[in-house]
């Protein structure tokens, strides 16, 4: 299981991304608009750079909801392969059966 600090750090990043999403989108739109003057676009880029680093969506990392594991993550189920195997073996995921041939 991942350290609790790492899980909490990721939750904090998710909150920051949600908080600044609208502001970041507006600044990006201004900065990428070719019809605006160059100076205004540059100021928008500077304001974008002043936002917290963790408010960017690219800083997020997918983690398992049960264990916090960052690798081997299934997006559809939001759990890792290990948690999937454990839940599948316990019969808690409908339609998932162990294959045998």
Swiss-Prot record:
GO annotations of cellular component type: cytoplasm; small ribosomal subunit
Q: Does the keyword Ribosomal protein apply?
A: yes
One Pfam entry name: Ribosomal_S14
- Gene Ontology molecular functions: rRNA binding; structural constituent of ribosome
Task: Tell me if Glycoprotein is a UniProt keyword of this record.
Answer: no
Under PROSITE patterns, the record lists: RIBOSOMAL_S14
Q: Which UniProt keywords apply?
A: Ribonucleoprotein, Ribosomal protein, RNA-binding, rRNA-binding
A single GO BP annotation from the record? Answer: translation
How does the annotation summarize its subunit structure?
Answer: Part of the 30S ribosomal subunit. Contacts proteins S3 and S10.
Which family does the record claim for this protein? Belongs to the universal ribosomal protein uS14 family.
- Role, per record: Binds 16S rRNA, required for the assembly of 30S particles and may also be responsible for determining the conformation of the 16S rRNA at the A site.
Record's protein name: Small ribosomal subunit protein uS14
């Amino acid at each position: 299981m991942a350290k609790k600090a790492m899980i909490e750090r990721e939750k904090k990043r998710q909150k920051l991304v949600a908080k600044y999403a609208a502001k970041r989108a507006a600044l990006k739109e201004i900065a990428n608009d070719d019809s605006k003057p160059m100076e205004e676009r540059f100021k928008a880029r500077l304001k974008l750079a002043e936002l917290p680093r963790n408010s960017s969506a690219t800083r997020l990392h997918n983690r398992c909801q049960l264990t916090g594991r960052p690798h081997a993550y299934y997006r559809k189920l939001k759990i890792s392969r290990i948690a999937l195997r454990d839940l599948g073996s316990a019969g808690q995921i409908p339609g998932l059966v162990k294959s045998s041939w």
